[in-house]
């Protein structure tokens, strides 16, 4: 697996030269793209040098072991360190999701359960917002439709966080949140104290850095305008400011009504549409690659139930990874790291298994 690393070392050296050229930074989109790739390769180069150094140290220790007991004692320690470094490098060489370094547009939609589901959708948004704050990311509400009790029938938020390392990107962490989230608790509307089960759906899309990344022909769009509505369906605007955009080639439909003007809603709608089309394009690429399709959690059915939040037991369980913990209160306050990490590790292992299988 390490045989192909020389090409990556050469690419890293070439990128270092290119990024020192002021002309490259005149094109911010190009500079950002090259910077992400350089950061990704820097981690691999560092891991490779660590393996080389430990290999040299181990060889020297073995050579001196027969003459010096201290060197002999170092041999098993260095062997363990080398094995760990090789495994780390092997994982670093697994091809990354090309969208890992991107920001995210995250949608939460109330599902079965009526008002309780809408309240749970609001709880999920709060959970993601607090997790984002802990990572130093920024949250922006793009569109939201509130329920009568203050929850969300649906909401779209942008999550932004600058990182040159794709492994630390917003999409790298949040892409595994897509799916159906089930909650078990006593609703605020329940007078008998009975536990109810409801659900909310989460969709996660990588956001494009520049509008030009996704080509959209105006001939492929149908744009309808209508009056925006608030909780209970009542009209909150006397003008046709809400916008519904249909993209014929993909069948994707985006509705936007939060902004005050039709133009602002159209711009917000196009922003979301570009993110959805980008995700759609990547899904088509994944579908052509059987190894990726089989290994990535990201490509699972969005209607799949991925997680259960059991409030009476203070328990959270991820049904894909087997993760279970009894600190639901902390998770709902943004302590989402261990849950997300379980999905990242499962995805890495699946990719590694697929890669190992293809090389046999």
UniProtKB/Swiss-Prot annotation:
Modification after translation, per record: Methylated by PrmC. Methylation increases the termination efficiency of RF1.
Location relative to the cell: Cytoplasm
InterPro entries: PCRF, Pep_chain_release_fac_I, Pep_chain_release_fac_I_sf, Prokaryotic/Mito_RF, RF-1
The keyword Mitochondrion is annotated on this UniProt entry: no
Entry annotated with the keyword Repressor: no
Chief location of this protein within or outside the cell: cytoplasm
Gene Ontology CC annotations of this record: cytoplasm
PROSITE patterns (UniProt xref): RF_PROK_I (PS00745)
UniProt keyword list: Cytoplasm, Methylation, Protein biosynthesis
A molecular function GO annotation: translation release factor activity, codon specific
Pfam families named among the record's database cross-references: PCRF, RF-1
Function: Peptide chain release factor 1 directs the termination of translation in response to the peptide chain termination codons UAG and UAA.
UniProt record similarity statement: Belongs to the prokaryotic/mitochondrial release factor family.
UniProt-recorded name of the protein: Peptide chain release factor 1
Organism annotation: Renibacterium salmoninarum (strain ATCC 33209 / DSM 20767 / JCM 11484 / NBRC 15589 / NCIMB 2235)
Gene: prfA
